[in-house]
């Protein structure tokens, strides 16, 4: 089943925070759309773009700016050879089967079309389209793609499941499992868990998985971030209830902050530098001592585009995770990409180390 998102209105296209909110909400309803189209209400091809998108997809969500809504309603009605009727204070296609404030749903030839009028800085109207995809997401760690496919594809064939792995970072894949008509996704997952114990995250959201398992185990975590600049803290605090497990974090960008706030020794910085395993180990211990948490994560590196040297080029990053019992893992990474992508990869590498040092609560399948 194909899905599509159409965003109408130039004002929406460049508001990245609002677009991220729209995408996150839609993913909860129809997963990740197979196609996303951006178009302005004044585009001369608007009619044909909508006609083509609706023809190609089965589930279509059309998000319009406030001043594009009425025009889109006319176009959608024309495409369905319908008139417009006043419903809930909206002039919308007459065959709309469900309608609420700023949202309505049409069913045409087994297709579902949900049109929404959105406003920046406001809560999105309700999505009326219902999730129908049989796809589920899970993650696999500590396997490379060839090995992952060799192990999972025979199982997938046995249970009539189509799998699509996506590489998050080295050794961490997000896998979409799509159930065919006669497939058995529950038995597929049981077999996967039996085949790969302590390598499977059976949850669609990796960060929510970490937060929920910390809460179940009544464990706390603290962060000492340098090159990631608070990104890991941001990832964790997107989840409601994280205050029960997240003690806090320090963005220790300058060496003087690493020394005075985290207790990193001057001789460590002078001898090894801030971008070093030795520094990250002391950052881990320093933030754990300050917060009295059960786990700590630390990052230090060169995200670029400047700051690299021959010995430590751009993309050189050290990440670490530790437990209060003294279990510590630190890794040196050589990453590629722009500044933001290097930071994101660093964050996930650090979180993967957390899964390992806390394997008794995260990977106890």
Predicted segments with their positions:
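Short alpha-helical segments enriched in small residues
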Residues: 2-131, 141-156, 182-365
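Phosphate-/polyanion-interacting regions in eukaryotic proteins
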Residues: 134-135
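Short beta-strand
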Residues: 164-168
């Amino acid at each position: 089943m194909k899905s599509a998102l159409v965003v109408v209105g130039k004002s929406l296209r460049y508001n990245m925070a609002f677009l991220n909110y729209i995408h996150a909400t839609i993913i909860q309803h129809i997963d990740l759309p197979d196609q996303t189209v951006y178009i302005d209400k004044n585009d001369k091809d608007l009619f044909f773009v909508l006609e083509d998108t609706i023809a190609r997809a089965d589930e279509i969500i059309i998000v319009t700016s406030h001043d594009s809504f009425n025009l889109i309603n006319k176009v959608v009605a024309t495409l369905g050879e319908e008139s417009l009727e006043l419903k809930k204070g909206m002039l919308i296609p007459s065959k709309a089967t469900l309608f609420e404030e700023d949202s309505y749903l049409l069913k045409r030839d087994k297709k579902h079309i949900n049109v929404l009028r959105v406003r920046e800085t406001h809560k999105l109207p309700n999505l009326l389209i219902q999730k129908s995809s049989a796809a589920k997401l899970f993650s696999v760690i500590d396997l490379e793609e060839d090995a992952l496919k060799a192990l999972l594809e025979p199982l997938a064939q046995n249970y009539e499941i189509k799998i699509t792995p996506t590489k998050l970072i080295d050794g961490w894949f997000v896998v979409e499992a799509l159930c065919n008509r006669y497939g058995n996704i529950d038995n597929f997952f049981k077999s996967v868990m039996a085949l790969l114990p302590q390598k499977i995250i059976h949850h669609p959201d990796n960060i929510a998985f970490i937060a929920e398992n910390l809460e179940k185990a009544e464990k706390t975590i603290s962060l000492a971030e340098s090159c990631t600049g608070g990104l890991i803290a941001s990832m964790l605090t997107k989840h409601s209830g994280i205050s029960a497990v997240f003690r806090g974090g320090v963005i220790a960008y300058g060496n003087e902050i690493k020394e005075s706030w985290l207790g990193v020794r001057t001789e460590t910085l002078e001898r090894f530098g801030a971008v070093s395993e030795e520094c990250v180990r002391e950052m881990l211990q320093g933030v754990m001592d300050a917060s009295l948490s059960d786990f700590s994560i630390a990052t230090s590196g060169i995200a670029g585009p400047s700051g690299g040297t021959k010995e430590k080029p751009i993309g050189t990053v050290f990440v670490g995770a530790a437990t209060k019992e003294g279990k510590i893992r630190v890794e040196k990474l050589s990453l590629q990409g722009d500044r933001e992508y290097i930071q994101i990869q660093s964050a996930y590498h650090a979180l993967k180390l957390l899964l390992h040092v806390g394997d008794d609560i995260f990977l106890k399948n």
